[in-house]
Each structure stands twice: as structure tokens, then as C-alpha cells.
């Protein structure tokens, strides 16, 4: 598992980044292992502010507002592929997380910032692996995977 983290948003102090990196690596690696049954994956994670994620959301999704997480898969699902992708090429893609959204949501949901940040990284990873939440059945399947990952790494609600 290789995770490249880009700290574009500077509100997280340098001395906290090491422990956050470890938690993010655990969450993403566990999501890949449980969902793709693989230990090999390469993911790029960029932590940004609301202004930057708003810009990306507008430019790439046509949604003119900030969001918490965006995922950009390097390989898109084709109609002849299964619902959950199984890559021979382990380059999964990019995840962008708004640190501001993560902080606000942690307060709203009554848990730690660390838990929310890792949850968003897991959520983004599952999108890279082909999960979606547009239909209720798919949403339930994705939520079960998210909760399984968060439970296994000890970051429960």
C-alpha cells in the first residue's frame, strides 16, 4: 500500500501530521484489503480548504458548492466490469478532502476530527474501488464496508 499525502491545507500542525498519516494509511489500506482483497494499491490524498474543494467540485462535477470529499478514479468502471472493481493495475486514483468540512462534520456528528478525516478517506477509497451510493441498496453496501473498516481500525462512532 502506497499513500501519497499532499498537505495543501495548513491548519494541521506539523507535529500532528505523523499520527494522522498513520491513521489515514490504516484506513485506506484496510478499505482496499476488505473491498478488493488486495494489499497493493497506490492512492494520492490531498487535504485542502473549502475554497479549493469548491473550485474542484464546480469544475469537475458542475456542483457550485464545497463538499467534504471528492474521488477521481484512474480507471473508470465499464459496463462489462463487475460492480466492485478488481484492478490488475494498483493505481487507484486521487482523493481530495476538505479539512474545514471534516472539522465541521466532526462537531456536528459528535466525534473526533481524526475519526471524521479517516472516515472521509475510507469513503473516498471505496469510491475509487467502484462503490457508489446513488441507489439505496448500493448505499447500504457502502455504509457496511465503511463501518467494517472503521471498526477494524478502532475508530468507532
From Swiss-Prot:
Top-level taxon: Bacteria
PROSITE patterns for the chain: UPF0054 (PS01306)
Subcellular compartments: Cytoplasm
GO terms, biological process: rRNA processing
EC code: 3.1.-.-
Disulfide bonds listed in the record: none
Recorded GO MF terms: metalloendopeptidase activity; RNA endonuclease activity; zinc ion binding
A matching Pfam family: YbeY
GO cellular component: cytoplasm
Main location: cytoplasm
Keywords from the UniProt entry: Cytoplasm, Endonuclease, Hydrolase, Metal-binding, Nuclease, Ribosome biogenesis, rRNA processing, Zinc
Binding residues for Zn(2+): 123, 127, 133
Free-text remark on how the cofactor is bound: Binds 1 zinc ion.
Cofactor annotation: Zn(2+)
Alphabetized HAMAP family for the sequence: Endoribonucl_YbeY
Annotated function: Single strand-specific metallo-endoribonuclease involved in late-stage 70S ribosome quality control and in maturation of the 3' terminus of the 16S rRNA.
Family annotation (NCBIfam families): rRNA maturation RNase YbeY
Family: Belongs to the endoribonuclease YbeY family.
Record-given protein name: Endoribonuclease YbeY
Species of provenance: Desulfitobacterium hafniense (strain Y51)
Encoding gene, per UniProt annotation: ybeY
Amino acid at each position: 500500500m502506497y499513500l501519497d499525502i499532499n498537505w495543501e491545507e495548513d491548519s494541521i500542525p506539523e507535529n500532528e501530521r505523523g499520527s494522522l498519516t498513520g491513521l489515514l494509511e490504516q484506513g485506506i489500506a484496510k478499505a482496499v484489503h476488505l473491498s478488493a482483497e488486495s494489499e497493493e494499491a497506490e492512492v494520492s490524498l490531498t487535504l485542502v480548504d473549502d475554497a479549493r474543494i469548491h473550485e474542484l467540485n464546480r469544475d469537475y462535477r458542475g456542483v457550485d458548492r464545497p463538499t467534504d470529499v471528492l474521488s477521481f478514479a484512474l480507471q473508470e468502471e465499464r459496463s462489462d466490469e463487475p460492480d466492485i472493481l478488481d484492478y490488475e493495475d494498483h493505481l487507484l486514483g486521487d482523493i481530495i478532502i476538505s479539512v474545514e468540512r471534516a472539522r465541521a462534520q466532526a462537531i456536528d456528528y459528535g466525534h473526533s476530527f481524526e475519526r471524521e478525516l479517516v472516515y472521509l478517506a475510507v469513503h473516498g477509497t471505496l469510491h475509487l474501488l467502484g462503490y457508489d451510493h446513488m441507489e439505496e441498496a448500493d448505499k447500504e453496501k457502502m455504509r457496511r464496508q465503511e463501518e467494517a473498516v472503521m471498526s477494524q481500525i478502532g475508530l468507532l462512532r
